[in-house]
Amino acid sequence: MRTSLVVCLFWLLFQLHTTHGYNTLVNLAGNWEFSSSNKTVNGTGTVPGDIYSDLYASGIIDNPLFGENHLNLKWIAEDDWTYSRKFRLIDLDDTVGAFLEIESVDTIATVYVNGQKVLHSRNQFLPYHVNVTDIIALGENDITIKFKSSVKYAEKRADEYKKIFGHSLPPDCNPDIYHGECHQNFIRKAQYSFAWDWGPSFPTVGIPSTITINIYRGQYFHDFNWKTRFAHGKWKVAFEFDTFHYGARTIEYSVQIPELGIKESDYYRLSATKSLQTRSKNIMSLSIPMEHEPERWWPNGMGEQKLYDVVVSMGGQVKEKKIGFKTVELVQDLIDPKKPEKGRNFYFKINDEPVFLKGTNWIPVSMFRSDRENIAKTEFLLDSVAEVGMNAIRVWGGGFYESNHFYYYASKKGILVWQDLMFACALYPTTEEFIQNAEEEVSYNVDRISQHTSVIVFSGNNENEAAIRGHWWKASNYTESQQVKDYVLLYQRLAKIAKKVAPTIPFIMSSPSNGVETEEEGGVSKNPYDVRYGDIHYYNEFVNLWRDDTYLTPRCASEYGVQSYPMKETMLNWINESDWEYTSKAMFHRQHHPGGIATNLLMIFQHLPIPAECGSKSVSDVPSCKYISSASYMSRLAYFSQVHQSIALKTQTLHYRRFRNTTTNEGLGNTMCAMYWQLNDVWAAPTWSTIDFEQNWKMAHYEARRFFSNVAVYSFADETDFNLKVFLLNDNPYLLHNITVNVQMLSWGNGLDPILTNEFHIDSVPAGSSEVLKTGITFSKITELSEYLYVSTLYDSSGVKIHEDVLVPDFLFEVDFNTFGDVQISDVQRIDEKTYDLTITTDRVSPFTWITCKKPFTGWFSDNGFHMIQRLRKIRLIAKFEVDLEKSDFTVCNLKNCYV
């Protein structure tokens, strides 16, 4: 907004005073003293931090994540804890205000400064700004924070609720196999901290964030935010400035976007206020002239991720951030207006271009929010997402609203963020106290998060609507209609807040849900899993996950997956070697998935050979085979589990991708979203992750590079007509011209030479499409599939290989593993301190070729878990940090001999 000289003079005449002043920030991070409720446990801790980390650092407990310490340390969460420290103030001259500013308090705590109570916190997801002007003093001061046990607080509130309303609020407790705590739905704290089916229970207390005393003379420029909107051919940017001040004054704000040649300023009158806790929110709206049209920000794989520097100054105080320009639209029109029963679309447009969401689900990177390694872990994980061609990630609703750095880094990497509100797998209180607390939480976090370019949608919760309709819990004296009523009350109020704060970001009530259809049904659908609407979550461990026809055909699959085990190299950092057995006590207690001990075996040995040591046992009898549970077989079993996971995720993901722009006669299809569960881990255990706790890529993450490739070829055996079907997938926003598809059929006993080759030439493959190719390759009966390997390779007009797909037999146990190649590492070349090239050779087909490195490194191979169908391949190791390696540090194996 340009301000004329006349307007400026008008403001100058009437201002009381303009203060530039200077401010002092007193950082309260560092050493604090902590003690238990009865003072018998005490020591020196660190802020930012938490009680588990401090007890471990003080030598009072062992590493909480090792062995069975998650069971042995439950006494910590059942106690109250006190943290305190002293701090010195050396200059209070001309001070007009002082604030205690805490980014996050975990969770139920009372804060005292110089003996005076200044704050009672009740929400981990909120910052606190407390006026301490009249409490602090020159010289020595003290601050004390008394934390209540989160476990006991939640239990107390649940008991109070039941007495008042005559029913409990499900679920009362987590399943026993979680080894967790109860009633997390009564505390506004990360829900996973009470345990989940992929993680332990560590209900932390502490200050996991920055804590400061801000002393200012005049005004304090706390932060700024913005919203972008594209309308009538112009970009509009609304900036909001967050200022603390005392007394009436006039402030000059300046906004610069140097690369766009923009420099705007204005004066704002800040009215007098008696309370420094009242912020002054001031809004400046800018319309960017067309001669400075910004470059659009695009998701990974669709264009550049252009971000502009924004510099805002106020009274000599300067803050800088990054801003990107994109539009987002959630399309939910009817599939067929003449037949509305066919349902609605559900897909996103970025900058008016439809985008297929290819991604995964994000859980917190640690059980301990303040872990010093969390930033590096976050960046590595998001790098790993972008590296394999993903463009989207869903921040799951049982963890945290992530840090600003997370959303910035996602924007930098081109990762679209689907953001849940932090409500998951539970029903929640609808008392006015609880709802107002939740509204404040949602208002703050949606406002904070929505400024980041990567964010494309907010979802009200994870699976809560589905839980009601699926009758997940027994709830005495609490009918389904009452549950629906309470659910709608809470989430309609939260939706109203989110839509007001971030009007340009779509909002959906839940995930899974039926999108706009859910709203038309009053907020809760009769069937939230209806594939004709919205998104679905799909899990089924009693079907064949390697078959394309197993899967549903939804509009969007925002969760799906299957477990695998980390390799021995990861697990032995966190359990004793004597516990490296499938059903050892330590391993059993790390398997939190109900039924997972049995179903993992049933799924794996549906495809892979049962060890000879089990005799003639059938697949259903495998869990009773003692050899399966022995230390001798565990490493082999972990490898098999990763083989199974990689093919299951590949098959399901490519099933969804092949239905892009394609519908059945019933209207199913137009699938535009495939986001598997889950990316990462919070501990070393059997989970659904594709990157383990030590940041090692599992086989499935390497497979993701293939199944998420922008241009891909996908083959499967269609058993309805005994034909090999090949699909061409093009997620690029442009046509592919003069494409060649080569389909080879290899026999296991015929070395590397194909017994059949067909080649197909395609003039063009449209942008954003899935095209089927009739190969003419048939088989007379299902058992023939085990005799061959099918390789489909896509080449561009210059003959350069774009993508390769290998269809392995469904029943690999029918194949003679002795026919597999003898794979070797023939050479290792050091390119630089972070890069090594490996030469891999084989004499015959080498399925699921797996390279390992003895020395741990943070990074990845250019490929792994691949099927080697040529005599030689070059594989590159890319490390994030310097690592000294030689040939003897590497090993390679395949399905024949890995971990035998």
Swiss-Prot record:
Glycans are attached at residues 38, 42, 131, 477, 576, 661, 738. It holds the Pfam family Ig_mannosidase. One of its GO terms (biological process) is glycoprotein catabolic process. It catalyses: Hydrolysis of terminal, non-reducing beta-D-mannose residues in beta-D-mannosides. One of its GO terms (cellular component) is lysosome. Its EC number is 3.2.1.25. The keyword Glycoprotein applies. Residues 1-21 form the signal peptide. It is an enzyme of class 3 (hydrolase). The keyword Disulfide bond does not apply. The active site is at residue 463. Keywords: Glycoprotein, Glycosidase, Hydrolase, Lysosome, Signal. It is found in: Lysosome. GO terms for molecular function: beta-mannosidase activity. Belongs to the glycosyl hydrolase 2 family. This is Probable beta-mannosidase. It comes from Caenorhabditis elegans.
